[in-house]
Every structure is written in C-alpha cells, then in structure tokens.
C-alpha cells in the first residue's frame, strides 16, 4: 500500500505540474503543446511517437500501480520512490525556472527567451531529465516486463 499511495502522489504532482502549466499558459494565449507541429519527416514522426507514448505510459503506470506487482526487492522499490520523487522536483524546478518560455516541443513561430540560469546551467533540458527520473522510478517501484519495454522506449526517444 505504501508504494501505491506514494506512486499516486508522485504521478499527481508530475501530471499536475505538466498539465497545470499548460492550462496557465493557455489562459495567457500561449500554445504550450508544440509536439509534432510544423515539423516534417523524421522529426515529426519522432515527436508524434513521443506524444502517443505520453498517453500510453501513464495507462501502463496506473495498471502497474493498481496491481502493486513487482519482481524487484523492497530496497529497489524504495530506491524507485526516491528517484521518482527527485524527478518531480526536477520537473517542477524546470517549469518554474522556464517561466513563460516553457513549451512541450519547439515552436518555429514563438520567439521565447533562452533560459540559461538556475537548473538550466546544469542541463539544456532538465524537464526531460525529470520525466525520465519519474518513469525510471515508477518502473523500479512496480517492475514488470511490459512496463519496462514501454519505459525504455520513452526514455530512448527523449534522449535521442
């Protein structure tokens, strides 16, 4: 029950931050979701695969949390909860630091300020780092092979 409750809190914060920021920016007339827009060829395909994965991974996460099944030891599950929590922290700091320049995807038309302070001194895209930490952490908490394959795909696409 500890892992289930913790994972639900982690995911609520994660998706709350992501969709909350999109909502707040939409109220200001800013189109946050730029994934696959204005792209062609390989770039568009990669971004659309990533967009589809962002729909299916949460479904897999919720199913894994619901079953509360993991083939990993309790120690690795605890490590997963720490890693996923770190991912939430990185994402929240990234979104707050980026202010209104934050986008999901790159807009060809919006001219935003390049953010180079705060967490962006360490990483060019710390939000993806936060995503990956959350996905890896939840994977460790509820390890199963289906979830493993989906998580690897998302992490691979975001790194590439």
Question: Can you describe what each PLM-predicted range is?
Answer:
Residues 1-109, 113, 134-160:
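Membrane-anchoring alpha-helices and their flanking helix-loop junctions
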Residues 105-128:
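Active-site-proximal inter-transmembrane loops
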């Amino acid at each position: 029950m500890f892992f289930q409750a913790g994972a639900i809190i982690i995911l609520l914060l994660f998706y709350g931050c992501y969709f909350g920021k999109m909502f707040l920016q939409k109220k200001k007339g800013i189109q946050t979701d730029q994934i696959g827009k204005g792209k062609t060829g390989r770039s568009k395909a990669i971004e659309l695969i990533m967009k589809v994965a962002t729909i299916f991974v949460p479904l897999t996460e919720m199913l894994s949390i619901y079953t509360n099944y993991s083939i990993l030891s309790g120690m690795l599950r605890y490590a997963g909860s720490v890693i996923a929590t770190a991912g939430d922290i990185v994402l929240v700091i990234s979104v707050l630091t980026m202010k209104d320049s934050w986008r999901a995807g790159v807009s060809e038309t919006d001219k935003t300020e390049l953010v180079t302070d705060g967490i962006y001194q360490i990483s060019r895209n710390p939000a993806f780092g936060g995503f990956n930490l959350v996905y890896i952490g939840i994977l460790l908490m509820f390890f199963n092979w289906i979830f493993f394959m989906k998580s690897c795909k998302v992490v691979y696409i975001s790194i590439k």
